[in-house]
Structure formats: structure tokens, C-alpha cells
Regions:
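Structural alpha-beta junctions
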Residues: 53-64, 120-127, 145-151, 224-234
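A generic structural motif
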Residues: 61-71, 129-132, 153-157, 230-241
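Internal, hydrophobic cores of structured domains that mediate oligomerization or house catalytic pockets
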Residues: 97-191
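A contiguous, surface-oriented mixed alpha/beta subdomain in the mid-to-C-terminal portion of proteins
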Residues: 157, 161-251
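Long, compositionally biased intrinsically disordered terminal regions
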Residues: 227-228, 239-241, 250-313
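Short N-terminal or domain-adjacent regulatory/targeting segments
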Residues: 1-31, 177-195, 289-313
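Extended, compositionally simple fibrous regions characteristic of intermediate-filament-like scaffolds
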Residues: 84-89, 93, 173-181, 197, ...
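An N-terminal, globular interaction/scaffold subdomain
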Residues: 1-120
Length: 313
């Protein structure tokens, strides 16, 4: 169900949501959080698809703020005045929750916090998500300051390097970036490989992945911090994601390799036959669901962001 509310206000939007809940015989108290999405019109549907998928695991109210909405509202006297258009999605069009899309015009664009406050789920955590371009300092952004968790995605920003530098400079304990979340399966498999005997020291490591790929440099920083060994980064312009990690040990080479475009990896350990294992490239849905599952600060990510330069990301 999709309901358009042109030239409206937050009171009318809240009333419409209450009306729809009453018609369906349900309550909004089952929502575990409010997800604020600060996005563009171009990116809106892609972000909502991911939010819908994530809401099946985390029933939530999604409030999307589209701040590049270009139309204007002109009063009869010919003056441009602030106004708000909105859309409410329920049922099959909204996952396990409801979606509110706000299209502020003119001066309202500068006051997103006043628009979303009346629409928040009471007594529930607030998560702010910027699917592409993030503010320079998310913790002091008008929406970010309201949130108990802030999610960015530096890899999908227009200027990835600048975004990484800003996030590092203005890091806050509640910040997370999906470039780190994409590494969860790789880190789990590598940790599992190192848990197997013999527990000999790692001498060096090498990682292969795309050029200017944030996850590649985060994984290298994690290995360097965890193993205290030199890590070589090899950039492959044709790769779309990380393709291999190689660890050198006295008794031979340990490797985790995933062919470009593949969804299976190969684990090779000294003295053992190579083993195939599922390792698909993580989708945006996967990453967002993981971050909504873990709202608490990630101490390992925090250490990497604080202690490692971002110039090469």
C-alpha cells in the first residue's frame, strides 16, 4: 500500500500512520528501532530495498529524507515558501514495518531534525544511515546527532578518499562504515584458519583486491594489527572485491582465494588438500542487517580507524 501526501505536515503524516495501524489491527510498539535514511532521489529506491530486506530481521520504522527534491511550492502571492510532500508505504511495500518518505522543499531542507522527531518510534533506538555521501562529521549532523548508531558507506561515496579521511578525523564511538562490515566473512574464515594447529607464527601477509577499495585497506590494517607482521597490498584494477589473502608461515603458505565474480573460495593450508567454501560477495542487504543487529560500538573497527592513516584508501 502506497499513500501519497502532497503539501502536508508531520501531524497529518503521524495521524495517517495511526489510522493505517488501526485499520490493520496492529501497533507500532513492535518496532525495534527507527531507521533514518538521508539519501537522494536517485538512490532512494535502492536504499529502501535494502531497508525492507533488513526489516524482516529487525522490524522498524523507516524514515527516508530526500533532500535533493527539486520541485518548488509557490504561494498565490508569488513567494516561494517551505512545504513538505510525503509518501507512506505499508504492508508488502514496506517490509516488516512502515516506510515514511519525506520530500522537504526550500527552507525545510535545512531542518530535517524537526521533521523526523514527531515521527520517531517512542522509546526505541535511532539509527542514521547515509547510503552514499555522508556528512563531514556524522555525529554533529542534524540527523546523526539524534542517532544512537550511525552507518556510512565510504566506498559508495562520490569522493571515497575524502570521505574516509573525514570519517577518520571526526570518528565517534557510535560510527560504523559498511566497508568494514563487508569484511566479516573474510575475517571469520581467516581467524578459523589460524586457529588450526600447528600454531606457528605468521611471518608476512599479502592481500589482493581492487584499486582504491576501502575494505582492502581495512583488512590489511586488521591483519597488521592482529598479527604484527608486514602486509603487502596488491591492487588489481579489474577486481570488483577482494580476491585473495596469503599468509606466509615457516611450514608453508596459507591462502584464502576467491576468483573474481565467484561465490566460492578455496582454503589452502600446508600439508592439507585445498577445501572449497561458500564466500559470496556481501550484498547491501546483508551488511545493513548486520549493522542493525549490532548497534553497540565496534571496538576493533574503532582502533583501526583511529590508528591507521586513510591516505591510500
Amino acid at each position: 500500500m502506497i499513500i501519497n501526501l502532497p503539501d502536508t505536515n508531520t501531524s497529518k503524516i503521524a495521524a495517517k500512520i495511526d489510522e493505517l495501524h488501526e485499520e490493520r489491527g496492529e501497533s507500532a510498539t513492535g518496532r525495534v528501532l527507527t531507521l533514518l535514511i538521508d539519501t537522494t532521489l536517485k538512490e532512494l529506491e535502492h536504499a529502501l530495498d535494502a531497508a525492507n530486506a533488513a526489516s524482516r530481521e529487525h522490524p522498524c520504522r523507516v524514515i527516508a529524507m530526500v533532500r535533493d527534491w527539486s520541485s518548488e511550492h509557490t504561494a498565490e502571492r508569488g513567494e516561494v515558501v517551505p512545504n513538505l510532500d510525503a509518501q507512506v508505504r505499508f504492508g508488502a511495500d514496506a517490509g516488516a514495518g512502515e516506510i515514511i518518505i519525506l520530500y522537504p522543499h526550500n527552507g525545510l531542507v535545512r531542518h530535517p531534525d524537526t521533521l523526523v522527531i514527531p515521527l520517531l518510534v517512542p522509546d526505541a533506538p535511532i539509527v542514521a544511515w547515509w547510503p552514499t555521501n555522508a556528512p563531514e562529521d556524522p555525529a554533529h549532523d542534524l540527523l546523526g546527532a539524534m542517532a544512537s548508531s550511525r552507518i556510512t558507506d565510504a566506498q559508495r561515496a562520490d569522493d571515497t578518499l575524502k570521505t574516509v579521511q573525514n570519517l577518520r578525523k571526526n570518528w565517534s564511538p557510535q560510527d560504523a562504515d559498511l566497508s568494514w562490515t563487508r569484511l566479516t566473512p573474510w575475517r571469520a574464515l581467516l581467524a578459523s584458519m589460524l586457529d588450526q594447529p600447528p600454531h606457528l607464527p605468521i611471518l608476512s601477509a599479502k592481500i589482493v583486491g581492487p584499486t582504491h577499495y576501502v575494505s582492502l585497506h581495512l583488512l590489511a590494517a586488521w591483519l597488521k594489527s592482529s598479527l604484527h607482521v608486514p602486509v603487502e597490498i596488491v591492487e588489481n584494477p579489474e577486481a570488483q572485491a577482494i580476491t585473495s589473502v596469503t599468509l606466509e608461515r615457516e611450514d608453508g603458505t596459507l591462502s584464502l582465494t576467491r576468483p573474481a565474480g565467484g561465490d566460492q573460495a578455496l582454503i589452502s593450508l600446508p600439508g592439507q588438500a585445498a577445501q572449497p567454501i561458500a564466500l559470496p560477495i556481501r550484498t547491501l542487504d546483508d551488511c545493513l542487517s548486520e549493522e542493525l543487529r549490532r548497534i553497540d560500538p565496534d571496538e576493533i573497527y574503532a582502533q583501526l580507524v583511529r590508528d591507521n592513516p586513510a591516505e591510500n584508501a
